[in-house]
Amino acid sequence: MTETTENTVNLPYRNPELPTEERIADLLGRMTLEEKVGQMMQLDARSGDLDDLIVNKHVGSILHTSPSDLPKAVETVNAKTRLGIPLVIGDDCIHGYSFWPGATIFLSLIH
């Protein structure tokens, strides 16, 4: 069990009653340099190694993860990260779905 699930529940950055600026200052003050750098990264998750991306690299966003891995990504953030910062999960609809074997690619106009 990590600090996230036990000790961060009542910290200022998790309190929606406080002003946003105060919550941000509190969270940034708790983050390590590695966590701050990681939060600025968006990495390809097709490898399936979500623990490495989320826990070791502290990524703020992942691309191209399998829909079946989404619950695992959320659970990894909640159970294995120090501060429980939510993860942004995205996919590139114009050509990103073509990364998956057998995916249907529909034509799309780009103006």
Could you tell me what each predicted segment is?
Residues 2-110:
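N-terminal beta-rich core of secreted/periplasmic extracellular enzymes
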